[in-house]
Curated annotation (Swiss-Prot):
SMART domains: AAA. This is Glutathione import ATP-binding protein GsiA. Residues 15-269, 325-564 form the ABC transporter domain. It comes from Salmonella paratyphi A (strain ATCC 9150 / SARB42). Belongs to the ABC transporter superfamily. Glutathione importer (TC 3.A.1.5.11) family. The complex is composed of two ATP-binding proteins (GsiA), two transmembrane proteins (GsiC and GsiD) and a solute-binding protein (GsiB). It catalyses: glutathione(out) + ATP + H2O = glutathione(in) + ADP + phosphate + H(+). Keywords: ATP-binding, Cell inner membrane, Cell membrane, Hydrolase, Membrane, Nucleotide-binding, Repeat, Translocase, Transport. Gene3D superfamilies: P-loop containing nucleotide triphosphate hydrolases (3.40.50.300). It is a peripheral membrane protein. ATP binds at residues 49-56, 357-364. Its EC number is 7.4.2.10. InterPro entries: AAA+_ATPase, ABC_transp_ATP-bind, ABC_transporter-like_ATP-bd, ABC_transporter-like_CS, Oligopep_ABC_C, P-loop_NTPase.
Length: 623
């Protein structure tokens, strides 16, 4: 049945009266209530709100994917204008018809790329499959187009990446592959669910500009779901604010940022971490806690130095980690990924050292090498005076009580077959620290500490939003009262209000228990809040390291300054010109076997502040 008369000629999508409910233990839970929206051709609509507010559920309903989770969807209308100008009612389409619509006319970039990519197929095969299905291209043509899309999303060595599997890429690389796949068929509507969450600020700036360029070329409508208000200010034309399943405010981006009317919108904007807010302060500071009922209420700030003088609890000396790449008829190792190259640093009890840098810079590999989840090629890792890089697995296990981790992808970290209570309790059972009622009480306490309810212990990971799953992972890491926590993008999936709560929780635990954090992040505003010291990584090497105040207020290395300049500002009237990198501005860290990377020489430029001296033949000199 034609619907063209029901949709304005400028609109590509119209939704009215959307209601989504789930049934759980005999009760109906309303996830979305009476949400309506319109999207014009070439327009970007940002949907913002806290974790669990219904943003992602709304997007899945538009893709007709939510019914498979047992949801009850009721909607007045859900009209889509396809690329061929035909207007269809999405709710009336059969599964077979929706398979032709998805990807070609309405595409989606999901929040967690590792769960969206097939682990048994190469990156090239997965992108090419979508191109063959919707464009009728041959296998060779599809692979050529897949390579072109990888080049467009600024992935270096794109030809080599085509033959790699998802697990061989960093989190940021996987997210860029997802974006390339979604854009490969040039859909009429693109739904982007936290597409830049896993990306560092420089790649984020490139991806946002790339989406804008493709949007203008194809007059594509974009629904951008995010918790990053800086991104909203940078990319959105209009904003829809969701709170507890309802649309509480909508308007132009200027209206929302400069004259918000709803208390929750005011709360969201007040909770946004601002780069430069720590100027003049040397120690980490809690985020101000703001409630929707009292948006002007800030808690007092009490600075307390938690760093314990004496011997470092963790020492790293000359750490090198490389990964072999096989090729040729005999599958020999011909090249290697130089993931981490000769880095050294110390971590003191009660200190937070942040590792920052672009995707693929070696931050996460450094954390995994310290946990012995990947083996280092050379170097020393000394924990509490004991060298652990050469310990056997049996001798290493007791030390794992003292070194815990929070990974970037929460869904991949939790067993989908077990309740979250079981997952949190598992470390206690393995190390013999709790059974029965005592362990259950500990689990309930941990869930409350990270902002969840004790009854959530009986639910499964798929029943939570991405932000809630990350909080569960944080609770599990705290279960054993560790001395060191390696937090790999621990708050990147959280909305701004919950992010502030979690950072405050980490700071509270540091004060109470003297925990040391190795905080791996691309969020410079959060790093500025939580850090005592900062180390900036580029292509596997540390190029600047020093006290947080020195690095942020007086960055010496050009790469550090580039990272600072790429941070989006949460104000649409303050767009800053940014240098957007071309693909050849991002050198590759893949080298021929036996080829050595020139070592970076660090110079002391201030108290505890070290900066790399650029080398003539080094990629750093081009910055």
């Amino acid at each position: 049945m034609p619907h063209s008369d029901e949709l304005d000629s400028r609109d590509v999508l119209s939704v009215s009266g959307l209601n989504i409910a789930f049934h759980h233990e005999g009760q109906q839970i309303d996830a979305v209530r009476n949400v309506s929206l319109r999207l014009k051709r070439g327009e970007t609509l940002a949907i913002v709100g806290e974790s669990g507010s219904g943003k992602s559920v709304t997007a899945l309903a538009l893709m007709r994917l939510i019914e498979q989770s047992g949801a009850n969807v009721r909607c007045g209308e859900m009209l889509l204008r396809r690329r061929n100008r035909q207007v269809i009612e999405l709710s009336e389409q059969s599964d077979a018809q929706m398979r032709r619509v998805r990807g070609a006319d309405i595409a989606m970039i999901f929040q967690e790329p590792m769960t969206s990519l097939n682990p048994v197929f190469t990156v090239g095969e997965q992108i090419a499959e979508s191109i063959r299905l919707h464009q009728g291209a041959s296998h060779e043509e599809a692979l050529a187009e897949a390579k072109r899309m990888l080049d467009q999303v600024r992935i270096p060595e794109s030809q080599a990446i085509l033959s790699r599997y998802p697990h061989q890429l960093s989190g940021g690389m996987r997210q860029r592959v997802m974006i390339a796949m979604a854009l490969s068929c040039r859909p009429a509507v693109l739904i982007a669910d936290e597409p830049t969450t896993a990306l560092d600020v420089t790649i984020q700036a490139q991806i946002l500009q790339l989406i804008k360029v493709l949007q203008q070329e194809m007059s594509m409508g974009v629904i951008f779901i995010t918790h990053d208000m800086g991104v909203v200010a940078d990319i959105a034309d209009r904003v829809l604010v969701m709170y507890q399943g309802e649309a509480v405010e909508t308007g132009s981006v200027e209206q929302i940022f400069h004259a918000p009317t709803h208390p929750y919108t005011q709360t969201l904007l007040a909770a946004v971490p601002q780069l430069g807010a720590m100027r003049g302060h040397s120690l980490p500071r809690r985020f101000p806690l703001i409630s929707a009922d009292e948006p002007a209420l800030y808690e007092s700030q009490i600075e307390q130095d938690t760093v314990v003088e004496g011997e470092p609890i963790l020492q790293v000396r000359g750490l090198v980690t490389r990964f072999p790449l096989r090729s040729g008829l005999f599958n020999r190792v011909t090249r290697e990924v130089h993931a981490v190259e000769n880095i050294s640093f110390d971590l003191w009890p009660g200190e937070t050292l942040s590792l920052v840098g672009e995707s693929g810079s070696g931050k996460s590999t450094t954390g995994r090498a310290l946990l012995r989840l990947v083996e280092s090629r050379q170097g020393e890792i000394i924990f509490n005076g004991q060298r652990i890089d050469s310990l056997s697995a049996g001798k290493l296990q007791p030390l794992r009580r003292d070194i815990q981790c929070i990974f970037q992808d929460p869904y991949a970290s939790l067993d989908p077959r077990q309740t979250v209570g079981y997952s949190i309790m598992e470390p206690l059972r393995i190390h013999g620290l709790g059974q029965g009622d005592a362990a259950a009480k500990r689990v309930a306490w941990l869930l409350e500490r990270v902002g969840l309810r004790p009854e959530h212990a009986w639910r499964y990971p798929h029943e939570f939003s991405g932000g809630q799953r990350q909080r569960i992972c944080i609770a599990r890491a705290l279960a054993l009262n560790p001395k060191v926590i390696i937090a790999d993008e621990a708050v990147s999936a959280l909305d701004v209000s919950v992010r502030g709560q979690i950072i405050n929780l980490l700071l509270d635990l540091q004060r109470e228990m003297g925990i040391a954090y190795l905080f791996i992040s691309h969020d410079m505003a959060v790093v500025e809040r939580i850090s005592h010291r900062v180390a900036v990584m580029y292509l596997g090497q540390i190029v600047e390291m020093g006290p947080r105040r020195a690095v942020f207020e007086n960055p010496q290395h050009p790469y550090t300054r580039k990272l600072m300049a790429a941070v989006p500002v949460a104000d649409p009237s303050r767009h800053r010109p940014r240098r957007v990198l071309l693909s050849d501005d991002i050198p590759s860290n893949i080298h021929k076997r036996g080829e050595e990377t020139p070592a970076v020489s660090l110079q002391l430029v201030g108290p505890g502040h070290y900066v790399a001296r650029p080398l003539q033949d080094n990629a750093l000199s081009r910055l």
